[in-house]
């Protein structure tokens, strides 16, 4: 296999020697009668005419695709969804009933205590 570098080819070809036709098909001769006008009275010899067959001495084979391809890094165009931390404020109400150590009956309502808690939700 021979490498063919030509300035007119976009990429190099590798030549692989080989015949397109078999040798029996290449040499095909056919006997044709001579078409000389009849005014000449001498006998005319028959002529041998060869039908032209194109013969290639080699075949041009393009290189494998992985030889002429440069490594192009793949770019991911789909943006990955990153989780954003969003602070949320929730009110937590604790209801505490206080009892005092006394014999008095307390008729007051239980105390309400409100704390603000900030949590991060992912």
Swiss-Prot record:
Phosphothreonine: modified positions: 98
Q: Which domain of life is it from?
A: Eukaryota
Report the principal subcellular site. Answer: secreted
> From its record, what is one biological process in GO terms?
lactation
Matching Pfam families: Casein_kappa (PF00997)
Subcellular localization is given as: Secreted
Q: Which residues are glycosylated?
A: 84, 86, 89, 95, 102, 118
Family membership: Belongs to the kappa-casein family.
Would you tell me the protein name for this molecule?
Kappa-casein
Protein species of origin = Elaphurus davidianus
